[in-house]
Curated annotation (Swiss-Prot):
Lineage of the species this protein comes from: Bacteria, Bacillati, Bacillota, Bacilli, Lactobacillales
Disulfides per UniProt: none
Alphabetical UniProt keywords: Antibiotic, Antimicrobial, Bacteriocin, Disulfide bond, Secreted
Protein name: Bioactive peptide 3
A biological process from GO: defense response to bacterium
Primary role: Has antibacterial activity against the Gram-positive bacteria L.monocytogenes, L.lactis subsp lactis and L.curvatus H28, but not against the Gram-positive bacteria L.curvatus CWBI-B28, L.brevis and L.plantarum or the Gram-negative bacteria E.coli and Pseudomonas sp 55. Has no antifungal activity against S.cerevisiae, Penicillium sp BKS-TAN2 or A.niger.
């Protein structure tokens, strides 16, 4: 998993 600020819908 790639860390991300906004979750994917």
């Amino acid at each position: 998993n790639i860390p991300q600020l906004t979750p994917t819908p």
